[in-house]
């Protein structure tokens, strides 16, 4: 199973929880992490390959004047996977999703003459493009099984890039993927991308927290599931401590800032720094648990020096 995930720097913290849950339930051979740095020091699993989007070829990093700047550069990377990755197919999962079960059956799907597999997007967004016949075909791009070989062969990547450069879309990458691939989609059960718009189902294998209602924001639908894996990750690592701090949550997509009290995970040195900077915002450091979690020791309290 080969996975691709894209994450901006302010989501690295949440990415660690997603990876923990993914590795817990699945045999994964490689994870391509598209990030804004050369690596994330505390994510040391050998299955992870970091790709710094700022060092990709210029033709990928260059924005068209028609690109919708409401979304980050990271949002468009999916349209370039066929050019960047030397793979036959990949499974893309958004950084705000959590894998809660084994998804090998999803990976094993033979796409044949289909460009990708995804879950139908219900509700108000299914017909926002105004394209005849699109209502029952529009998919959410948060979880995609992508046939890179076919996309290269039929030059669908070129078609997507051309649309990005010549027309403005409400949801740029998701819209162009739907427009270009609308007749080449294998439709999946919503258990593989359970959202508020695709349907929040009890037997979901991948829960996708869309819009501002993220899993790490307490009170969001099914946030207790995200926190279940978050807490497991803490318990199974010997390199973590908890601290309390004020965090400023900045979601550019909805243009507001929220201050919340929350527990974040940092190394001991970082914890000492936080204690002297109580107003520090955007704490996004976490350590990846050991590969063999059964051998990891729980953190122990240090005795006070007399």
PLM features: residue spans?
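N-terminal anchoring/stem segment of glycosyltransferases
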Residues: 1-60, 210, 229-239
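Terminal and domain-boundary regions
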Residues: 239-306
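A glycosyltransferase accessory/donor-loop signature
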Residues: 1-7, 17, 33, 141, ...
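Short Gly/Pro-enriched turn/cap motifs at secondary-structure boundaries
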Residues: 70-71, 133-136, 166-169
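GT-A fold catalytic core of metal-dependent nucleotide-sugar glycosyltransferases
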Residues: 56, 74-124, 136-138, 145-146
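Short, charged, surface-exposed secondary-structure boundary motifs
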Residues: 58-65, 125-130, 197, 216-219
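Active-site-proximal specificity loops/subdomain of glycosyltransferases
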Residues: 45-83
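Short, polar loop motifs at secondary-structure junctions
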Residues: 35-40, 55, 122, 191-194, ...
């Amino acid at each position: 199973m080969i996975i691709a995930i894209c994450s901006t720097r302010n989501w690295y913290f949440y990415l660690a929880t997603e990876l923990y849950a993914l590795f817990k339930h699945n045999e994964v051979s490689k994870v391509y992490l598209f990030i804004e740095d050369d690596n994330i020091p505390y994510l040391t699993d050998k299955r992870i390959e970091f790709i710094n989007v700022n060092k990709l070829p210029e033709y990928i990093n260059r924005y068209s004047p028609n690109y919708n700047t409401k979304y980050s550069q990271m949002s468009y990377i999916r349209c370039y996977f066929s050019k960047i990755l030397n793979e036959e197919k990949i499974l893309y999962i958004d950084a705000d999703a959590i894998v809660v079960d084994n998804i090998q059956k999803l990976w094993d799907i033979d796409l044949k003459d289909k460009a990708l597999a995804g879950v139908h997007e219900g509700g108000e967004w299914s017909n926002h493009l105004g394209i005849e016949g699109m209502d029952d075909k529009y998919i959410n791009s948060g979880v995609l099984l992508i046939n890179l070989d076919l996309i290269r062969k039929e030059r669908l990547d070129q078609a997507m890039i051309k649309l990005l450069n010549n027309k403005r879309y409400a949801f740029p990458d998701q819209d162009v993927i739907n427009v270009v691939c609308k007749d080449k989609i294998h439709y999946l059960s919503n258990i593989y991308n359970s959202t508020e718009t695709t349907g929040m189902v009890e037997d979901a294998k991948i829960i996708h927290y869309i819009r501002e209602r993220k899993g790490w924001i307490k009170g969001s639908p099914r946030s207790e599931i995200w926190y279940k894996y978050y807490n497991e990750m803490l318990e199974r690592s010997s390199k973590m401590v908890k601290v309390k701090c004020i965090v400023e949550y900045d979601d550019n997509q909805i243009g507001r800032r929220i201050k919340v009290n929350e527990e974040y995970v940092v190394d001991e040195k970082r914890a000492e720094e936080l204690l002297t900077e109580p107003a520090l915002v955007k704490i996004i450091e976490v350590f990846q648990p050991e590969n063999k979690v059964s051998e990891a020791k729980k953190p122990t309290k240090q005795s006070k020096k007399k």
